[in-house]
């Protein structure tokens, strides 16, 4: 079972990713031209939601899924995907004022719409929020692996290693 703090971060991140999916689906639904950046943003949000929230939900019921190495790899991939999606969308829209008519007309993602401008800027913000949460989770998972090992055993740099039993046995050992 995962810790309460880990579950709380997963819930907050799921909310950010659901909001991002809503914003990106609004962009996809109103587009007149194909945009690979917007499509990648949708992939990154759905992948993050499935691997983070669904895997976390299942790991709470099946403890065999709570391997720190698997959690670290999934969190790292989610960090990379959300960072790349946020950066690609931010570079694509250039984040100018949504009242600038020349900017609205010349941008291939915004396509002349003020509402698409606001949606894309909000999506960038929520992707970066999610990216930051994944970075925190990668850091915590790395520290957990260093203490407890990659598969939950005490093979890491743990200070809590079992002491060698030497000498006369105590009453609890008899």
Curated annotation (Swiss-Prot):
Regulation: induction: By ketoconazole. the promoter contains a sterol regulatory element motif, which has been identified as a UPC2-binding site.
InterPro entries linked to this entry: Marvel, NCE102-like
Keywords in alphabetical order: Cell membrane, Membrane, Protein transport, Transmembrane, Transmembrane helix, Transport
Stretches assigned to the Extracellular side: 29-41, 91-122
Cytoplasmic side: 1-7, 63-69, 144-174
Membrane topology summary: Multi-pass membrane protein
Highest taxon above the source species: Eukaryota
Chief localization: membrane
Keyword Protein transport included in the entry's annotation: yes
Record protein name field: Non-classical export protein 2 homolog 1
Protein source organism: Saccharomyces cerevisiae (strain ATCC 204508 / S288c)
Gene: FHN1
